[in-house]
Amino acid sequence: MERDLSQLWQNCLLQLQDQISSSDFGLWLRPLQADTSMPNTIVLYASNMFVKSWVENNYLAQITKIAQDLSNNTDLVIKVQEGSKPAARKVVAQQEIANTPVQHSAPMPENEPQAAFRSNLNQHHLFENFVEGKSNQLARAVGQKVANRPGDKSANPLFLYGGTGLGKTHLLHAVGNGIIAGNSNARVVYIHAERFVQEYVKALKAERIENFKKFYRSLDALLIDDIQFFAGKDGTQEEFFNTFNSLFEGEKQIILTSDRYPREIEKIDDRLKSRFSWGLSIAIEPPDLETRVAILMKKAEEKNIYLPEEVAFFIGQKLRTNVRELEGALNRVHANADFTGKAITIDFVRETLKDMLALQDKLVTVENIQKMVAEYYRIKVSDLKSKNRSRSIARPRQLAMALAKELTNRSLPEIGKAFGDRDHTTVLHACRTIAALRDDDNNIQEDWSNLIRTLSA
């Protein structure tokens, strides 16, 4: 029993890692120690009273539901206590998630009843709470279309790509939940690519590969996150190739995500890359300032946090990488305000997030952008600063200026100075020109996406 509860807690952590930001997971949940020595009970030990209270108030209900769902045991009790591990009990320290074996989404045996079918979908990830902006507008619109008409070959497969923490997983779950909302009998499964690999290997070892095939090829929709984890896994790729063909021919929906464009994924069979491109491939970019502010305000509303708009604007200006980073920052601010009893002001946020803000300032600089753009277009950095007005130089220069405005905290005059002492109005014109071209010119939009993704990595 103790071993079963220990494994249950590890599987619970896997689901929690998918459902909350990495910063929150590392701050509040990873340090917890689980005592599984008592029957039907998991006791989580927190390092101090503040952590105990925070976990109880913000995560205990979520943890309990996941654990009860995974174990099919509504009587299972999860408790949080302050202190370190009891000397007389075996306490399981948290392992690295990457090394944890996966148990909870194994393929169903042939005789398993429909009632036991588990989609692995996060019920909280919906279209309604997905904050839409220019960076993800197309992806959301197509996702909604797929949810309403799964299997339509115009968007099958749907391939979403972009950096970490930009909302790909949220959108994946939203589409899956949307499909089920339209057809409660639809067999929809969400799974991370790494878990798919583990299940495949486990099925091979247990000589249950036919059950594995039958399960995945019987689905109405298969949603696989981070498909780049298939790289170098030849056996898994071969099996997925056949599963893909079976689902596609049966007009069943396939949705995949990756951190890069299909053709850029290394060590993936060319046959698979070709199939990834059969439907629609859509980039999700880092959110622009307006979207970042909207995300912060939405998250604050969901968590019942009073966040002044000027504070949201300040955080949005400073943290530009991804949604998880924004949510992690908001949670840290809330925790500190709750602990100290102080009001959430710009000065309070600046002090609370000083390490994050200092790191962000170091990550992307105008100089980094100039170097990356020059390499991308195979020109020299000196060309970007020169008076050369030929199209082959002027367009990359405008793009670099627009990227500097988007990704750094430098003012327009400071950016202009870095590009050969140009006036701030020149920078403003460049930003407006690139914004217009991104709407009308697919090549410019693709260049922008590639550079944003590289600089934000």
Swiss-Prot record:
Question: Which stretches of sequence are listed as region Domain IV, binds dsDNA?
Answer: 338-457
Broad class of where this protein is predominantly found: cytoplasm
Q: What does the record give under GO molecular function?
A: ATP binding; ATP hydrolysis activity; DNA replication origin binding; lipid binding
**Domain-related comment:** Domain I is involved in oligomerization and binding regulators, domain II is flexibile and of varying length in different bacteria, domain III forms the AAA+ region, while domain IV binds dsDNA.
* Domain I, interacts with DnaA modulators: annotated span: 1-81
Subcellular location(s): the record lists: Cytoplasm
NCBIfam families, per database record: DnaA
- Similarity comment: Belongs to the DnaA family.
What this protein is called in its record is Chromosomal replication initiator protein DnaA
GO BP term, pick one: DNA replication initiation
- Organism superkingdom: Bacteria
Any idea which UniProt keywords this protein has? ATP-binding, Cytoplasm, DNA replication, DNA-binding, Lipid-binding, Nucleotide-binding
Record keyword Membrane present: no
**What exactly does this protein do?**
Plays an essential role in the initiation and regulation of chromosomal replication. ATP-DnaA binds to the origin of replication (oriC) to initiate formation of the DNA replication initiation complex once per cell cycle. Binds the DnaA box (a 9 base pair repeat at the origin) and separates the double-stranded (ds)DNA. Forms a right-handed helical filament on oriC DNA; dsDNA binds to the exterior of the filament while single-stranded (ss)DNA is stabiized in the filament's interior.
Which HAMAP family would you find in this protein's record?
A: DnaA_bact (MF_00377)
Locate the region Domain II: 81-119
Q: Which residues bind ATP?
A: 165, 167-169
Segments carrying the region annotation (Domain III, AAA+ region) are 120-337
